[in-house]
Amino acid sequence: MNQDLVEEATAQIKSLDFSKSVVMFSGGKDSLVVMDIAKKAGLNKSVYINSELEFTISRRYVEQMKENYNIEDVIPKIDFFEFCRRICPPSKRLKWCCKVLKLALSMKHAIKTGNFYQLTGIRSDESDRRSKYEVINADPFINVNKRYRFFQVNPILYWSEEDVWDYIRENKLQYNPLYDRGVKRVGCWCCPYTTRSEWELARDLEGENFQKFKNIIKDFSRNLPANFRNRYNKKGWRSFATNYNKIEVLKMTNNKNSFVLEGKKEYLEKIEHLIFIVADRYKIEGSKLYFERNIELQRRQIRLVLEKPLNCVGCDVCTVICPVNALYLENESIKVDPTKCVGCLSCCKNINGKLKMGCIARNYKTERFCITF
């Protein structure tokens, strides 16, 4: 084992403020090495995002590792299968799963605990994209909340896979049993990027959940054109993408800064959850909602905010974007706390990157309720 690599990683970890740092343990070999080096350096604090998409073997392994390491589970409030029903099964082109079940959870945990320096097992030789990473990244993909800065720390960025295994063997670390089954990279068993052998392993090891996912794929295919259903059920779901079905439920008109939304009361009551963000004053009369705004705001920005509650699936992603924590979920529906909202409009500005304007439903649901103007 190259001890210089270990010393460099140790020094990097020791340079951090431990009160603001945490190891993001995935159950894989790379983050295992980081977690062990961090513990020896004095940082025995790890988080495992338990999305319940990992192999059962992996989750049991993480439980065993808690005997030697301080690992906290972070679990989504709504499970993967329910999100599949509310949004769609994930695919290579509709990758909502990582945003909802990984990224947003890690951001919420950082905001809650103050652990904004997240140590990972990322290595530069894993992909072309990761070869461009630095040891400490002010992650541009998750810096959408202007109040906080999130840092990704990669202590073993320049290690090779052989270096990782050498460290594990020399330190007699207990690694994930999945590697002994030929798995190259520990991850989600139902990932659309899985190889054929990994898919077969999932079928063998995750029998009940595997069948549940297959049934969800089959149920979803019933809404597709007849000539595509069979292909979708077999392998087509992996690369699936389609134009969404636009369901117009409200019509918006305006005269300068006076606006009228017209439609069924049930939809008006939903947008009432967020109307405070874009309106100085408002009232509902029958099938119409009247509101005024003194500061000029583009209609598409107003629509971006008000379509959130119309399509909300309870994913919690948009709440991590608000810099004053004014957005929250109640009964799995997005709402705003008027006592916290400062009118910064972060929730309706164009947010590039992984969180896609902070609304998973507006970007990935195949049927979306819309406001027209």
Placement of each model-derived feature along the sequence:
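Iron-sulfur cluster-binding cysteine motifs and their immediate structural context
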Residues: 317-333, 346-371
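Long, compositionally biased, intrinsically disordered segments
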Residues: 286-287, 311, 333
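Short linker/helix segments within small regulatory modules
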Residues: 180-183, 328-340
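Local cysteine-cluster metal-coordination motifs and their immediate loop/turn environment
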Residues: 100, 184-197, 310-324, 339-353
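Nucleotide-activated chemistry modules centered on ATP-dependent adenylation/adenylyltransferase
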Residues: 1-301, 305-306, 359-373
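Intrinsic-disorder/low-complexity linker and hinge segments
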Residues: 302-305, 322, 336
